[in-house]
Curated annotation (Swiss-Prot):
It is found in: Cytoplasm. Transmembrane segments: none annotated. It catalyses: cytidine(1402) in 16S rRNA + S-adenosyl-L-methionine = N(4)-methylcytidine(1402) in 16S rRNA + S-adenosyl-L-homocysteine + H(+). Specifically methylates the N4 position of cytidine in position 1402 (C1402) of 16S rRNA. S-adenosyl-L-methionine binds at residues 32-34, 51, 78, 99, 106. The gene is rsmH. It comes from the Bacteria. This is Ribosomal RNA small subunit methyltransferase H.
Length: 310
């Protein structure tokens, strides 16, 4: 069983205002920390926990063994949220939570290929049954596409140099391991830049992971479905870990928190002119100093919460 320290555990679930008899969805089961904390608060309620990683689901069966009658596990991508709920014959739920990013077990289990600190085959698939892996991205995607993902998903300012170096190296032989890729990235970045801004491979590894799993596309699709799936008065909690996710989350919530332009002179605002949701957190909630002392991965976490109005 793997060990995972859940970020913003109580804040994320407590912001949902749990109804003991309500139906809730944990779209990112991961290490099952949020699911466990939530399901303990249910009486007649039920929790649907989704993850595309079978390892996470197997692990959660152990962690939640005392609550299995209150949980339905679904192995699927959360971009299919509407279909998942329809298959379970659920019309609306009371709350949904997302904890985006890679769970500690995926980072810590070397063979999954997520970590630039451990040698492993280039993989990075959250769903081990999918075809596209980091190996295909690194060895087959054209230079222009690599530059695009490194810049867009990694905000890497040396995207062109790194992509050019990858292109040159893979012509000699396939790039097969995380260690090989790290050395190529280091060689492509000017020496002064390697000594600042954290690990030199951090941004490229993030970019490849996002591309392999279509993380931003999946989240954008899922959060739109979530907004339509929560009943009025219900809430959605989202933890993001990098600026791309947070920006996307902020934009979607901002869009739905505005109603259409209201004609002047109306004594009351008709329902059709009211926004779909309201923001509970004007500014994102971040980890306390106490949490940061125990979990360095919480440093970049931001929690945004909205309440559905109609």
């Amino acid at each position: 069983m793997f060990h995972h320290v859940t970020v913003l555990l109580e804040e994320t679930v407590d912001q949902l205002n749990i109804d003991p008899n309500g139906i809730y969805v944990d779209c990112t089961l991961g290490g099952a920390g949020h699911s466990l904390y939530l399901v303990k608060q249910l009486q007649e309620g039920h929790l649907i926990s989704i993850d595309q990683d079978q390892t996470a689901i197997d692990n959660a069966h152990i962690i939640l063994k005392d609550y299995l009658d209150k949980v339905t596990f679904v192995k699927d991508n959360f971009r299919n949220l509407s279909d998942i709920l329809a298959h379970l014959d659920i019309q609306k739920v009371d709350g949904i939570l997302y904890d985006l990013g890679v769970s500690s077990p995926q980072l810590d289990v070397g063979e999954r290929g997520f970590s630039y600190h451990q040698e492993a085959k280039l993989d990075m698939r959250m769903d081990q049954t999918q075809t596209l892996s980091a190996y295909e991205v690194v060895n087959t995607w054209p230079y222009e596409k690599l530059v695009s993902i490194f810049f867009r998903y990694g905000e890497e300012k040396f995207s062109k140099q790194i992509a050019r170096k990858i292109e040159a190296e893979r012509e000699l032989k396939p790039i097969e391991t995380t260690t090989e890729l790290v050395e190529i990235i280091k060689a492509a970045i000017p020496a002064p830049a390697r000594r600042t801004g954290g690990h030199p491979a951090k941004r490229v590894f993030q970019a490849i992971r996002i591309a392999v799993n279509d993380e931003l596309g999946a989240f954008e699709s899922s959060i739109e479905q979530a907004i339509d799936s929560v009943k009025p008065g219900g809430r959605i909690s989202v933890i993001t870990f990098h600026s791309l996710e947070d920006r996307l989350c902020k934009q979607v919530f901002q869009e739905y928190s505005k109603g259409p332009d209201i004609p002047r002179g109306l004594p009351v605002v008709p329902p059709e002119y009211q926004p779909k949701l309201k923001k509970i957190t004007r500014k994102p909630i971040t980890s306390s100093n106490e949490e940061l002392e125990h979990n360095n991965r919480a440093r970049s976490a931001k929690l945004r919460v909205v309440e559905i109005l109609k």
